């Protein structure tokens, strides 16, 4: 599990990105690069790191579910992910 400070930092940054999303898109349409430079750099969605929403693990992230492969496996075995079942071939 990642440090609690990393998890909190990630959540805080995601809120910041959502806060400035509409303003960023308007400024980009107008090509107002001076205005864009006034917005905090951390408000850019490119700077976000995909992290597990449960325990903050930065690697092995599955986008569709928003969790890491380890948590995905654990929750799938417990039957807590709707529509997910173990397959065999």
Swiss-Prot record:
One of its GO terms (cellular component) is small ribosomal subunit. It comes from the Bacteria. Pfam families: Ribosomal_S14. GO terms for molecular function: rRNA binding; structural constituent of ribosome. Keywords: Ribonucleoprotein, Ribosomal protein, RNA-binding, rRNA-binding. GO terms for biological process: translation. InterPro entries: Ribosomal_uS14, Ribosomal_uS14_bac/plastid, Ribosomal_uS14_sf. NCBIfam families: PRK08881.1. Part of the 30S ribosomal subunit. Contacts proteins S3 and S10. Belongs to the universal ribosomal protein uS14 family. Binds 16S rRNA, required for the assembly of 30S particles and may also be responsible for determining the conformation of the 16S rRNA at the A site. This is Small ribosomal subunit protein uS14. The gene is rpsN.
């Amino acid at each position: 599990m990642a440090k609690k400070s990393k998890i909190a930092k990630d959540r805080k940054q995601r809120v910041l990105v959502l806060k400035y999303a509409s303003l960023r898109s308007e400024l980009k349409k107008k090509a107002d690069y001076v205005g864009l430079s006034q917005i905090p750099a951390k408000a850019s969605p490119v700077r976000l790191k995909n992290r597990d929403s449960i325990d903050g693990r930065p690697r092995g992230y599955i986008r569709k579910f928003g969790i890491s492969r380890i948590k995905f496996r654990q929750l799938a075995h417990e039957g807590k992910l709707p529509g997910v079942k173990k397959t065999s071939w």
